[in-house]
Regions:
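Active-site-proximal, structured, solvent-exposed surfaces of multi-pass membrane proteins
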Residues: 9-10, 14, 661-792
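Membrane-embedded helix bundles of polyisoprenyl
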Residues: 25, 128-141, 147-228, 241-261, ...
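Membrane-interface coil-to-helix junctions
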Residues: 28-132, 154-176, 264-269, 277-321, ...
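Membrane-interface helix-loop junctions at the exits of transmembrane helices
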Residues: 32-41, 68, 107-114, 147-169, ...
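Periplasmic/ER-lumenal interhelical loops and adjacent helix-loop junctions
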Residues: 52-55, 59-72, 239-242, 246-336, ...
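Extracytoplasmic/lumenal acceptor-recognition loop(s) of multi-pass membrane glycoenzymes
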Residues: 87-89, 93-97, 475-493, 508-578, ...
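Membrane-embedded alpha-helical segments of multi-pass membrane proteins
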Residues: 122-130, 172-180, 216, 321-326, ...
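Contiguous transmembrane helix-bundle modules in multi-pass membrane proteins
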Residues: 188, 192, 211, 342-501, ...
Length: 792
């Protein structure tokens, strides 16, 4: 098909270098990870998000989508609702930010579930190889010698952004796939090729909707800067083709985009806007210095800073560093070229980086600061650098000295006098982590020294590109090992037993008593519920069911990127049907000191100590009383969990429609919120609980016997994607307790089925299914047309 064939200009010499680039990037990535892979016995673990989320998510979702765990739901629907994700969440919406649309994740489904922890490094190697290959294809257009395109691809793949974001893992998917889309845009603009751009738009959209928003903005900047520089002529036909393929690509990815958008719009973290001065300036001066130096110095570890004590720095992916040379090549290019589109693109990106409202435009105007879009200008910086290297007339050594001076100037942060406000004693330096700073500065200056030497000795010789490539790859390998090591061993005191706990959890999964209930953990590693395939109160993940983000805060429980209700909130355990709590032998005494009297020792299994909740209430129960949301919000926050064991919270509208089935809670009952009364409330709720409750991979099935018509409450996060069936008849679902669900059931023995399909999936699936034949016909037409032209 013509739409998917390289033009003659791209074949031959270029194709050989493409596979060389892929191989070199794969080899370099493998060498970076090899020491840690061997140290960890194949189960590579790093720190923070990589350990807590990425390993767990990849392994869990591999089994979930293959049907491991819970049975299919009502009507045969399956694999749409994950019980192990927080209190339960729609799978597509919870994981589309992390992996649901990633081609690398879907590739990993070829392997058994238990292999996944050991495949994290091979998958990362593959991602870096794909990143290098895509960057090579893009950069080949802008150099005469393909060896410099190989160099640029290495600069991009092993940039500071690439190494930093190993910590987040799924960000590397974005690094890998973006250059292919930019290459496809160039092919459309310059070669008038058809199909590739639509295809890569769809792939990048499916891969990560969050990053796709920023990619759209960057493509607009890229297109306008190139057009304004006169690098191509925009005709009505070209504009129409670009518009059509853009829309077609979005339509192909619409199956994931639309349900995710509907879910994300309910997430407070995505719609919290800044205002006033917050639009225009950062609140801390250090933020500006950090942004500027992040383009010059090698990156710190994601969770600790070398210099900065203020500003939003950690976990932001704030780095645009190019390995070995930093911005030395960029400065040489900048001085030599006039009216160049790449200079315009970088200038615009720098303005966007320094103005909060413009920076947040890459994330749909979210107020949280991130620099996770820097990988896109990094590709342009790599293009500028290799273009400068290819020009023998440019002075490459002088800019290296200028960048080195900027790096050396940061010693001021280490040498500035500081007087302690309390003791009045003087000391030197404001560094937050002197050891890491020394390592970063040493690599920055050392890289420039090697680069300066290579330029002075070999710039005018044919081996220049090969010497630079050797330097870039060697530097990337060494710095990559040190960078990962700083982050990994910085948390070694807490993460050294991570593999043991996760492996023990797999054994415990087989030894737990049968039944469908929730668990809680105390001072274990994150996301243990994903390894046990159980809904767990302790969960670390940004994109769980949005209603959780209203339910928990109403109880005074913080819910930002994790759910972590305090052990002291004992009533929450009864409300949410927690039956067992897990801790380790090392923390058993500490648990005894903190826990209420409602826990009794159950057993010690597979390295864990289990406690049973004496106030456990099976999931699905009824109430005698109700409260309005207004009354509920007027109560004291710390004891609201106790109150929810006594009365159901209804909206004003639902009180009108369903209040007849319950009695308004007497005023006197609002105050008796002691532990003793809580145990009685649990007994009352237990008496009306469902006789059967079965979790499914699409919701749940329940059976109950009621002496009168009543609202049956389920501590499952409300979601517009749920459909409820009572005795086979579709029934309205009530949003109660500011985020959970209830349904009206008649008197007698009833069966209840909740079935989940992502809200908006019917429309999104229809759009994508309609777009597929359009895409095939579109590309097929131009393939046939090209074939006819070749014959003649």
């Amino acid at each position: 098909m013509t739409a998917f064939h390289s033009s003659p200009r791209m074949l031959g010499q270029k194709q050989d270098k493409f596979w060389l680039t892929v191989g070199l990037c794969a080899l370099t990535a493998a060498l970076i990870f090899l020491p840690f892979y061997l140290l960890d016995g194949g189960f590579f673990h790093y720190a923070g998000d990589f350990n807590s989320q990425q390993i767990s998510f990849y392994r869990y979702m591999n089994g979930f989508l293959k049907g491991a765990g819970y049975p299919a739901g009502y009507g045969g629907v399956k694999n749409t609702f994950s019980w192990a994700t927080d209190l339960g969440s729609g799978t597509m919406n919870a994981y589309s930010f992390y992996l649901y649309g990633s081609p690398f994740f879907w590739f990993s489904l070829l392997f058994p579930q238990n292999w996944l922890p050991y495949l994290m490094v091979p998958l990362l190697v593959l991602k870096f190889a794909v990143a290098g290959g895509g960057a090579y294809l893009y950069l080949r257009r802008y150099v005469k010698d393909p060896n410099f395109a190989v160099l640029g691809a290495a600069l991009y793949a092993f940039s500071g952004w690439g190494l930093y974001n190993i910590f987040f893992n799924h960000f590397i998917d974005v690094l890998a796939l973006f250059p292919w889309m930019l290459w496809a845009l160039d092919e459309t603009i310059y070669e008038r090729r058809h199909g590739w751009f639509a295809f890569w738009v769809a792939v990048n959209l499916l891969n990560n909707y969050f990053f796709f928003v920023g990619q759209v903005l960057f493509l607009v900047i890229y297109f306008v800067c190139k057009l304004s520089a006169g690098e191509f002529r925009l005709t009505p036909r070209l504009f129409g083709q670009l518009a059509f393929e853009s829309l077609l690509g979005v339509a192909l990815g619409f199956v994931v985009l639309w349900p995710t958008v509907l879910s994300v719009l309910q997430n407070p973290r995505t719609i919290d806007l800044s205002s006033g001065w917050g639009f225009l300036t950062y609140s801390k001066p250090q933020q500006y210095l950090a942004i500027l130096l992040s383009w010059v110095l090698p990156p710190d570890s994601p969770y600790m800073t070398s210099i900065w004590s203020e500003g939003i720095i950690k976990w932001t992916s704030m780095t645009a560093y190019l390995p070995l040379c930093s911005l030395a090549g960029v400065v040489a290019y900048w001085r030599a070229r006039q009216g160049d589109s790449k200079k315009r693109i970088i200038a615009v990106c720098m303005v966007f980086a320094l103005v909060p409202i413009l920076n947040s435009a890459f994330y749909a105007l979210n107020s949280s600061y991130y620099a996770r879009w820097f990988y896109m200008p990094v590709l342009i910086l790599a293009a500028m650098t290799v273009s400068a290297w290819e020009d023998p007339s440019l002075d490459l050594a002088r800019p290296a000295r200028s960048i080195a001076f900027v790096m050396i100037a940061t010693l001021a942060f280490a040498l500035v006098p500081v007087q302690d406000a309390a003791t009045k004693e003087w000391s030197l330096g404001v560094l937050q982590n002197p050891g890491q700073y020394c390592a970063v500065l040493a690599f920055g200056l050392g890289g420039l020294a090697v680069y300066h030497c290579i330029c002075r000795r070999w710039q005018q010789r044919r081996v220049f590109a090969r010497r630079l490539l050797a330097g870039v790859l060697a530097f990337s390998c060494l710095f990559g090992i040190v960078h990962i090591g700083i982050g990994k061993f910085g948390q070694w005191n807490t993460d050294s037993d991570l593999v043991e706990q996760y492996i023990n959890a797999l054994a415990l999964k087989e030894d737990l008593p049968e039944g469908d209930w929730r668990i809680d953990t105390y001072k274990t590693h994150d996301n243990l519920g994903l390894w046990l395939d159980k809904s767990c109160l302790q969960y670390f993940g940004s994109t769980a069911a949005p209603s959780i983000l209203s339910f928990y805060p109403a109880l005074g429980v913080k819910r930002d990127v994790r759910s972590q209700p305090e052990l002291s909130n004992y009533a929450l355990r009864g409300l949410l049907s927690v039956r067992y709590l897990l801790t380790t032998l090392a923390h058993q005494e500490q648990f005894h000191a903190e826990a209420d009297e409602g826990w009794t020792y159950y057993d010690t299994l597979d390295g864990y100590v289990l406690y049973e909740n004496q106030n456990y209430v099976p999931m699905g129960f009824t109430y005698d009383y109700y409260l309005t949301e207004t009354q509920y919000e007027d109560t004291v926050t710390p004891t609201r969990s106790n109150l929810l064991m006594r009365a159901l919270v209804l909206t004003e509208e639902d009180v009108v429609a369903y209040g007849q089935y319950l009695t308004p809670l007497p005023t006197a009952e609002l105050n008796d919120l002691t532990y003793t009364r809580y145990t009685q409330d649990c007994t009352d709720r237990r008496a009306s609980a469902c006789t059967t409750f079965e979790m499914t991979s699409a919701g749940f099935h329940a059976e109950a016997t009621l002496d009168r018509a009543n609202l049956m409450f389920f501590s499952v996060p409300y979601d517009d994607g749920f459909t409820a069936y009572v005795d086979g008849q579709e029934t309205e679902i009530l949003r109660v307790d500011e985020g959970l669900m209830a349904v009206l059931c008649p008197a007698g023995t009833v069966t209840i089925d909740f079935v989940y399909q992502p809200d908006g999936i019917r429309l999104s699936r229809t759009v994508t299914l309609a777009a597929l034949p359009v895409f095939l016909l579109y590309t097929g037409h131009f393939a046939w047309d090209e074939k006819k032209r070749r014959k003649h």
